[in-house]
A protein has these predicted regions:
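Non-catalytic cap/lid and distal C-terminal segments of serine-dependent acyl enzymes
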Residues: 1-201
């Protein structure tokens, strides 16, 4: 699924792109149906709080781990489809700013795990990283100063807020740019992730 700003059809402007991943057991509709990503974006844009951008939401249930088992979590198949096929397709069929610094990847829970794996393996593709209840980045993950423009990490206050906050502090102390957000009073749920998307945008 692809979200385009309301103004998209009215001109020839090119836009940055966010590749936004769902969690375990969900599909490409999750961020629209449960996450209300389109409404969050429309409101932020209408209020002049953010510059418009495109969101691509794709199916990510391609890893090898099985729910309830101790399987190896692999994003190899999804990585190939996303980076080698989907990104070029989106850049050729939509008016995107087709360069790393205008391309972000973020995800919730399992989608955050996919995001971390893929952004670190393909640093030439994405310039902005976002993990929502999906782990953290460490300074050792970032190999060069120009690898990423900003790292965003979030979770609910009933999850592991100290870990997210500490990770952002450590990244900033190492000279990288990172922000953390803790959704007050929420757990591993879409209220956390809706609020996180609002902050990320």
């Amino acid at each position: 699924m692809v979200y385009t700003p309301a103004e998209y059809e009215k001109g020839k402007k090119k836009y940055p792109v966010l590749y936004l991943q769902h969690g375990w057991g969900e599909d490409e509709t999750a961020w629209s149906r449960q996450g209300h990503a389109n409404l969050i974006m429309d409101n932020l844009i209408a209020e002049g709080k953010i510059d418009p951008f495109i969101i691509v939401m794709t199916y990510g249930m391609t890893n090898e781990a099985k729910f309830g088992t101790i399987g190896a979590f692999s994003t190899n198949d999804f990585e190939k489809v996303l980076v080698d096929e989907l990104v070029p397709y989106i850049d050729s069929h939509f008016r995107t700013i087709a360069k790393k610094d205008s391309r972000a990847m973020a995800g919730l829970s399992m989608g955050g795990m996919e995001t971390k794996s893929i952004t670190l393996k393909r640093p030439e593709t994405f310039g902005w990283y976002g993990l929502m209840s999906g782990g953290t980045y460490a300074p050792s993950d970032i190999k060069s100063a120009d690898q990423v423009n900003l790292v965003f990490m979030s979770c609910g206050s009933k999850e592991n807020p100290a870990g997210v906050t500490k990770a952002a502090e450590e990244l900033n102390a190492a000279g990288q740019k990172a922000v953390s957000y803790v959704s007050e009073g929420t757990a591993h749920e879409f209220l956390t992730w809706r609020r996180s998307l609002y902050q990320l945008a």
